[in-house]
From Swiss-Prot:
Enzyme Commission no: 2.7.7.38
Broad EC category: transferase
Gene3D superfamilies xrefs: Spore Coat Polysaccharide Biosynthesis Protein SpsA, Chain A (3.90.550.10)
GO CC terms in record: cytosol
Protein name: 3-deoxy-manno-octulosonate cytidylyltransferase
Keyword match Metal-binding: no
An example molecular function term from Gene Ontology annotations: 3-deoxy-manno-octulosonate cytidylyltransferase activity
Keywords, comma-separated and alphabetical: Cytoplasm, Lipopolysaccharide biosynthesis, Nucleotidyltransferase, Transferase
Compartments where located: Cytoplasm
Length: 248
């Protein structure tokens, strides 16, 4: 099957300035992400960035770059700019990999593309089971609940579904009903065009989760359990050191 990978790589980062160019064992982080994307079998891979130094690093590694504006409010808006500049047809399948995921398994990049291709929805994503109580109650770990057909009912930073009887007695064990959302998305290009035409939703602004805009406007997001659990993403200097050690 045919699909395109777009990797947004914003240079500015409050917790880790110049994040895409941080060195991981001799290569910039964005190059590690690019290499993982290549292993997925994507037909085309584009790094979308607002900074010339990131563009130079990607081009030096033989990658394709699309320069984007620096004032986008979300990663999806940056994707939409690339979709328009590259004039992708509405049925083109696009997988969005974050530029701070140097350990993302190539298999799940392809998985989300294949799931979208076999679904009637315009958007697809992945999740993994939560086994750790600390993660279950951590608002930085986004949870998702699905319906019987594998479509998202809701995403939240809260602990959903709330196991009333279990949690009334103890929060040390969590059962097997919780899923953590992974920030990888597949879209049809036409869906991205529609998404950015919608006003931000109240739920999205409360939870600070832009995927809630899709549910607010009555659209569906296909969710599947990831074939592999992705490694550590990089948000902080501590994350960066962990990834360096794991990839050494």
């Amino acid at each position: 099957m045919s699909f395109v990978v777009i990797i947004p790589a914003r240079f500015a980062s409050t917790r880790l300035p110049g994040k895409p160019l941080q060195d991981i064992n001799g290569k910039p982080m964005i190059v590690h992400v690019l290499e993982r994307a290549r292993e997925s079998g994507a037909d085309r891979i584009i790094v979308a960035t607002d900074h010339p130094d990131v563009a130079s690093a990607v081009e030096a590694a033989g990658g394709e770059v699309c320069m984007t504006r620096a004032d986008h409010q979300s990663g999806t808006e940056r994707l939409a700019e690339v979709v328009e500049k590259c004039a992708f047809s509405d049925d083109t399948i696009i997988v969005n990999i974050q530029g701070d995921e140097p350990m993302i398994p190539p298999a799940i990049v392809r998985q989300v593309a294949e799931n979208l291709a076999s679904s009637s929805s315009g958007m697809a994503t992945l999740a993994v089971p939560i086994h750790d109580a600390e993660e279950a109650f951590n608002p930085n770990a986004v949870k998702v609940v699905m319906d019987a057909q594998g479509y998202a009912l809701y995403f939240s930073r809260a602990t959903i579904p709330w196991d009333r009887d279990r949690f009334a007695h103890s929060r040390e064990t969590i059962g097997d009903s919780l899923l953590r959302h992974i920030g990888i998305y597949g879209y049809r290009a036409g869906f991205i065009r529609r998404y950015v035409s919608w006003a931000p939703s109240p739920l999205e602004q409360i939870e600070m989760l832009e995927q809630l805009r899709v549910l607010w406007y009555g659209e569906k997001i296909h969710v599947a359990v990831a074939a592999e659990v992705p490694g550590t993403g990089v948000d902080t200097p501590e994350d960066l050191e962990r990834v360096r050690a794991e990839l050494r």
